[in-house]
Structure formats: C-alpha cells, structure tokens
C-alpha cells in the first residue's frame, strides 16, 4: 500500500539492552533523571495461587453466545504501489473452515481458496470491480460481496457547513441495518456562554457523504469534554441505537425539542450567572435537569428518555476535600460511557461518574425499546482503603476479567463487578505491610499481555506524585500490583503494547522518566527519551520518547504500531 504521511510509527525500539534493575521497594533515590525526575522501583511477590485460580476460571469459562452487531464483510479495495489491496472483515461467528475466492471483473484471482482476509492484486486498474465469495469444504456457498476499487487510499466527503464549528470526535456504527458502518461526528462551536450563538451537535453521515440527521444538544452543556455518546445495536434489531446525555432544549433528528420537563419555567440554564461555575478556564453549568436518551440510529428521533443516574446533585457529595462550586461542579460533571455485557448475553449501557473523589455508577439495558435499570452504585466510605473512592480514570474498559461470562467495568485503579458491586481498589504496600490506595490517573491498558498466562493484566499511570507506585502493572482480576515505578511527579501517560519481538509478551512505558520495560519489570533500555523512530513517511525522529497516545495494527503483522 502506498505510504501515507499520517504519523504512524514503526515501534521496534533501538536501545541498549540492560539486565533487570528491579528490586525490592526502593525509595526515590533509586534513579535520578537529568530532567529532574527521581525514580524508584516497587516490586511485590507474584501470588502464584491466584494466578493458578485465574487459569482454572479461564478453562471453566462459560461459552456464552453474545448479541453482536450484524455486520457484512466490509469489503474494500484500496490502491497501492503496483496494485490494489483487497481486504475484508473476519466475523466472530465464522467457522474455522471458512475460506474465500476473489474475483476481479469476473476473473478468479486465486489458485486455491484464500485463508486470510486480504489479497494484493498486482497490476489492478483503478475502479476495478471485485467480488468476494465464501467457500466451505471447497465449494462456494452462494454468499458473496462486491465492491469497486477506490481511486485513492482514503474516502472523504464534505460535511454540512456550520460556521465556527470544529469536528473534534467521532464514532462508527451500522445505523440503518445495511451491514455497513455509518459515521457519527461531534461538532462544537465556541463554547463561551457569553458569546455563543449555536450549540454542540451530533451528526450522522453515510460514507458517501449523505447526511442522515443532526441532534442539537442545546444550551445546557457548555463543556465539550463532557459530551459523550455511544452507538451500538442494543436491542438486536440489526440497527444501532445512539445513546447520550440530553437536556431540556435538546432537539432530536426529527426536530423534536425537549421542553420544560420540571415546570420551573426555564429551559436554558446557562442564562443565569449564579448557575455558572468556572474551574481552570472551563465553564460548567451547576444545576440543570439531565436525562439519558435513546435515539433511532437511522432517523435520529428520540425513542425513550429516563432521568440520568447517578445525579450530580447535591454537589457536596462529590468531594470532602473541597467546598468551592467550581471544583465540585467539575467533579460532578465528569462522566464516562461504556458498553458491557453484564448478563453475559445482551449489551448494557454503563455510566461512571466522578474520578478524583466520589465515584458512582449506573447501568441500563434496553427492553422493548425502553431503558431498564440494571443497578446504581454509590461509593460511600471515603476513608476505607478498599473503597473505590478517588480511584477512577478519565476512561473505562469493559471486559470479563474473572471469566464468569459477564463483563466487569475497569477504570485505572478500580474495578466494578457485573452486578454493580465493588471488586477492588488497587493498593500497594510498604515493607511493614501498610496499604496505600492508588489514585486517579489519565491512562491505562488492559490486555492479555503474557503469552504464558490467560488472565488479563493492567498497566496504569496515576496523577498523584510520590505514590509507592504511580505507574504500575497489576492483575486485572484481583487488583494485585506485581511491580511498578515510584516518582516524584505526576505520571500523566502510559502505554502497553507488543512493539518488540525480542521480548516475550507486551512492552510497557510511560511519561516522566518511565524507562521501557518488559512484562516482568526488567528495563529494556537505559533511557526513557533517547529513542529513534522511523515514521511511515520514512523520516526519523531522534531523542524522542516512545509515543503513548494510541496504538494501531497497521502493517499486517502482529506487532502494534503507534498513532500519535
């Protein structure tokens, strides 16, 4: 494929290899970085009994048939150097014996059935027509897919013109049930409440640029980072629903506007100065009715609405450390959306609210087109080291870490079980056995990082400085930390991925002097910011940290690339 100039970096690192420098927990004098960071190691004995229990749970896991999207193969043909790359989707329902035949303008291209999900057609012409046919036991089944080769290696289209708007987020889902993804965009204008003349919107488009609908969020959200939405086929009808927080003044894709639901005569709560709060140059609305709404994916029409839980009121519940309205409103406004199979079969919407102090959560599934509440969780005991109070990130992951067939909700240093109960808050221990709960952080990864272990592991960073481990590697089922680094400063980023084939399993790294390591905690370099990278356009970055914002599988092998 022709190389684009997108910043995707081949991530096999060149560095001087070191023997393990891990030790028993050391204080901050273990390492002094030239940039002023001090670094110590935290190491705990791996609980082999719990590790064995995880393997037993994995072997005995139920084989649930989960309700998934009904997608097609996603057949595409993209021009590259000296030919066309044709690729398609492998589905979770596919049999191990399924193979394929590929045709171009009626001519079969493969000598024997294709066992992979791509084929490079040398010398193909632009706009050639390709047909993919499924093969079982050497015979074509009659199921086939057709596509026309693109004239360039991307597709683009014009969006609806909106003066002063930025596109700053997006998602994909099959909104109309044709088996192909459509595109959803979040677009925001100026969010200054004193000067704005328009409001944030969510738009849906087909990949040919056809505009499907627009939802106008209205005047009662003025902080774009708190505008989240989820798009997925929640009820199994073949079409994705769109689920998001809504307000009085929100207008759906059919032009229906939510009115004065509480009868107080107000639908724009941003007009009152006393109802506005500012914290670190961001504006927040202190009090407004909040809802959770379902929108038809094909039309954008609201089909159900319920009161949003957990409520952000009273504000005093969201911190015992602060009493100023700005901080309290910021904490109450922070929320995360996710999708989890809490019963092991059907998807539920999960909301987690709060991060730095109080953490609350709720979940719903969709039944007969209506919200059905699964549970609501309130974190009560702020003084309990085992409580998830103060232990939540800006992101969440849903995954079945205990292999009971049902998803858990993980957010950095905490986990909530499928039934809404707290599983654990991650802790570390000093040499006297005293526990320290690890706090809120900005990034984490959950994956099967060790090829010799079937359990999930978490690599996470934490904001608070001078923790015994403010970047660490822990068991995602039990929360037990195996090793980590202590810092004298906030560790704001971390990343875990398999980027180097010379080490078993994943590699881990992070910001603020986090030296890259293997999954055993052995340093694999003598620096954290002296690397050279070849970007996809062939240029080289020198004296750089390993990028840690996003990872992708880009070039067809089993190593990760880094998108930055």
What are these regions (language model features)?
Residues 1-4, 241:
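Short, Lys/Arg-rich N-terminal segment immediately upstream of the first membrane anchor
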Residues 36-50:
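Terminal, intrinsically disordered low-complexity segments enriched in charged/polar
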Residues 34, 40, 96-97, 102:
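Beta-rich interaction/scaffold domains
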Residues 51-74, 81-83, 90-95, 101, ...:
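Beta-propeller-forming repeat regions
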Residues 4-25:
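Sec-dependent N-terminal signal peptides of Gram-positive bacterial secreted proteins and lipoproteins
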Residues 20-38:
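Sec-dependent signal peptide cleavage junction
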């Amino acid at each position: 494929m022709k190389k684009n100039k997108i910043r995707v970096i081949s991530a096999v690192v060149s560095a001087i290899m070191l023997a393990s420098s891990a030790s028993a927990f050391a204080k901050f004098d273990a390492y002094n970085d030239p940039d002023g960071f001090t670094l110590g190691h935290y190491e705990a004995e791996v609980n082999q009994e719990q590790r064995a229990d995880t393997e037993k749970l994995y072997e005995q896991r139920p084989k649930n048939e989960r309700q998934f999207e009904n997608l097609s193969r996603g057949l595409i043909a993209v021009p590259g150097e000296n030919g066309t790359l044709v690729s398609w989707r492998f589905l979770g329902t596919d049999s191990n014996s399924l193979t394929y035949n590929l045709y171009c303008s009626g001519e079969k291209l493969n000598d024997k059935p294709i066992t992979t999900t791509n084929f490079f057609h040398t010398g193909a012409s632009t706009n050639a027509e390709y047909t993919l046919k499924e093969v079982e036991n050497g015979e074509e089944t009659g199921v086939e897919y057709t596509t026309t080769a693109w004239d360039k290696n991307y597709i683009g289209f014009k969006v609806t013109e909106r003066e002063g708007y930025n596109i700053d987020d997006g998602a994909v889902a099959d909104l109309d049930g044709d088996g192909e993804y459509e595109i959803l965009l979040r677009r925001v204008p100026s969010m200054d409440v004193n000067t704005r003349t328009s409001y944030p919107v969510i738009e849906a488009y087909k990949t040919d640029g056809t505009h499907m609908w627009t939802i106008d969020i209205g005047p009662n959200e003025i902080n774009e980072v708190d505008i989240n939405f989820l798009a997925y086929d929640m009820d199994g009808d073949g079409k994705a629903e769109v689920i998001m927080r809504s307000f009085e003044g929100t207008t759906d894709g059919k032009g229906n506007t939510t009115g004065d639901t509480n009868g107080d005569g107000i639908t724009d709560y941003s007009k009152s100065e006393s109802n506005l709060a500012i914290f670190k140059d961001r504006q927040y609305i202190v009090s407004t009715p909040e809802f959770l709404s379902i929108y038809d994916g094909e039309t954008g029409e609201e089909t159900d609405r319920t009161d949003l839980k957990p409520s952000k009121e009273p504000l005093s519940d969201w911190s015992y450390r602060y009493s100023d309205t700005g901080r309290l409103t910021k904490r109450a406004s922070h929320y995360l959306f996710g999708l989890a199979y809490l019963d092991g079969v059907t998807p539920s919407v999960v909301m987690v609210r709060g991060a730095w102090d109080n953490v609350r959560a709720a979940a719903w599934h969709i039944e007969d087109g209506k919200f059905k509440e699964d549970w609501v969780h309130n974190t009560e005991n702020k003084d309990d080291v085992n409580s998830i109070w103060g232990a939540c990130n800006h992101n969440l992951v849903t995954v079945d870490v205990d292999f009971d067939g049902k998803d858990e909700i993980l957010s950095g240093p905490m986990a909530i079980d499928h039934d809404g109960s707290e599983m654990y808050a991650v802790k570390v221990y000093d040499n006297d056995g005293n526990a320290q709960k690890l706090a809120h952080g900005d990034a984490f990864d959950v994956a099967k990082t060790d090829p010799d272990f079937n359990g999930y592991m978490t690599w996470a960073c934490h904001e608070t400085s001078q923790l015994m481990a403010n970047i660490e590697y822990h068991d995602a089922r039990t929360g037990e930390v195996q090793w980590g680094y202590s810092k004298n400063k906030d560790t704001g980023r971390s990343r875990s991925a398999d980027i180097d084939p010379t080490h078993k399993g994943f590699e881990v790294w992070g910001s603020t002097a986090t030296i890259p390591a293997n999954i055993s905690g052995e340093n694999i370099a003598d620096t954290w910011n002296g690397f050279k990278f070849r970007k996809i356009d062939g240029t080289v970055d020198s004296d750089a940290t390993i990028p840690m914002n996003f990872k992708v599988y880009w070039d067809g092998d089993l190593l990760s690339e880094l998108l930055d």
